[in-house]
């Protein structure tokens, strides 16, 4: 079954909470998603929330990570990072776990297929994204990204050929696309701006996938300013 378009819900970005901010009324029955507007890991869960139409059910709590409040570690997440989800009296962290949790525990269109072959391939891709893909591309910034990332981007290109019933990794839009897009979004901007390397050249499936993702308001509302991405990623060079 095709994913139904989520309701259009335009949100104003609230000022992030910092070291001077009081905490929200924790565990008062409100479901809260603690994020940073610029964190790709948090963006995964933010996109999932939006695609499932949960803007009313899950309240965003933006955090200023460079000047984060002490209560983030003391009262919310002992790891002192985002994303973190406050739901049913407990806190859950780690982005790949959270996108599955939100998909399974809240109403809205399912973002993971029932088909066993697709689920198996999806799990392979979810393992690859953080363990190999992200590390490989970040590691290339000190060397030659064109050579050092070719296998990683080719892996993505080939994965997008696996199923022919849609332009996404598993055919239809799924959690796998949500896991990859925050990083590919940033890598595309940074590699083009700094190294003049356009990752979609010679990769038509990747190009088509990015084009489709950019048609989704639920995703585009979460994107990070390109200038910020370039300046932030330069620290890894």
UniProtKB/Swiss-Prot annotation:
Per UniProt, residues of the GST N-terminal domain are 29-110
Q: Which GO terms describe its molecular function?
A: glutathione transferase activity
Localization per Swiss-Prot or TrEMBL:
Cytoplasm, Cytosol
EC identifiers of the protein:
2.5.1.18
Q: Does the keyword Protein transport apply?
A: no
Any one cellular component term from GO for this entry? cytosol
**Domain of life (superkingdom):** Eukaryota
Stated role: Catalyzes the glutathione-dependent reduction of S-glutathionylquercetin to quercetin. In vitro, possesses glutathione-dependent thiol transferase activity toward 2-hydroxyethyl disulfide (HED).
Task: Output this protein's name.
Answer: Glutathione S-transferase L1
Which source organism does the UniProt entry give? Arabidopsis thaliana (Mouse-ear cress)
Q: Which gene encodes it?
A: GSTL1
